[in-house]
């Protein structure tokens, strides 16, 4: 699997395209903004998008959805606990930015559910704290975790937004993510990649 990173939107959000190099099938994680850039990249390289995965519903992770879905009729997955945030401009913080945006077309997954996308077995891990329905996506075979705004390089997500909880977030990282193998590569929603082993040893917030 090849993972391509795009830093998009005013908040510098990491959007990922994970590609099966054998057949060009791919899925996207957190299309933050500028969907034309993503669509052009997919189209010119002959990739076949299968789905979008959302780690949570904050505006800076979802505002590229509408443009992307105009090009591709593909499902969008989020954790079921995140429905209220996706459907509220106040909760997803877009109203605070002056342009209210909501998304009601998600398919809702459950904690522990396995999504099969192009041969990749992707486990949904509920990691509340940054938002009540935030989640991470783990691909055991590839040793890869898409952590959204739950876990960053030497940091963790903010908890001062609606439905956030610092105690929940620390517990999510310690009890759900730090049980993964140390060599697991972490692709976060902002900043640089890291690993579970590095964060267990050096992250000052957990």
What positions do the PLM features span?
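Residue-level detector of beta-strand structural context in well-folded domains
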Residues: 16, 107, 112-113, 135, ...
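Active-site neighborhood of phospho(di)ester-bond hydrolases with catalytic His/Asp-centered motifs
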Residues: 28-29, 50-57, 76-79, 126-129, ...
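Short Gly/Pro-enriched turn/cap motifs at secondary-structure boundaries
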Residues: 6-7, 104-106, 126-128
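Active-site HxH/HxHxD metal-binding segment of metal-dependent hydrolases
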Residues: 33-116, 205
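Metallo-beta-lactamase
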Residues: 93, 121-206
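Short acidic-hydrophobic surface loop/beta-edge motif
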Residues: 6, 18, 113-119
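A generic "binding-loop/recognition-motif" signal
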Residues: 11-12, 34, 58, 82, ...
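Conserved beta-strand hairpin/beta-sheet module of binuclear metal-dependent hydrolase folds
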Residues: 1-45, 137-148
């Amino acid at each position: 699997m090849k993972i391509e990173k795009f830093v998009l939107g005013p908040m510098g959000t990491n959007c990922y395209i994970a590609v099966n190099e054998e057949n060009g099938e791919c899925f996207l994680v957190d299309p933050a903004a500028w969907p034309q850039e993503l669509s052009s990249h997919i189209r010119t390289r002959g990739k076949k998008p299968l789905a979008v995965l959302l780690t949570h519903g904050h505006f800076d992770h979802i505002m590229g959805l509408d443009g992307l879905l105009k090009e591709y009729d593909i499902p969008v997955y989020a954790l079921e606990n995140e429905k209220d945030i996706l459907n509220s401009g106040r909760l997803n913080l877009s109203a605070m930015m002056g342009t209210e945006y909501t998304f009601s077309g998600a398919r809702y997954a459950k904690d522990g559910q396995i999504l099969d996308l192009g041969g990749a077995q992707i486990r949904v891990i509920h990691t509340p704290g940054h938002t009540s329905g935030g989640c991470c996506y783990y691909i055991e075979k590839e040793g890869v975790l898409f952590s959204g705004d739950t876990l960053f390089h030497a940091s963790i997500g903010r908890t001062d937004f609606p439905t956030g909880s610092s105690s929940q977030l620390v517990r999510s990282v310690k009890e759900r993510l730090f049980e993964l193998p140390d060599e697991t590569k972490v692709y976060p929603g902002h900043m640089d990649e890291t690993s579970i082993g590095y964060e267990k040893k050096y992250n000052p917030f957990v």
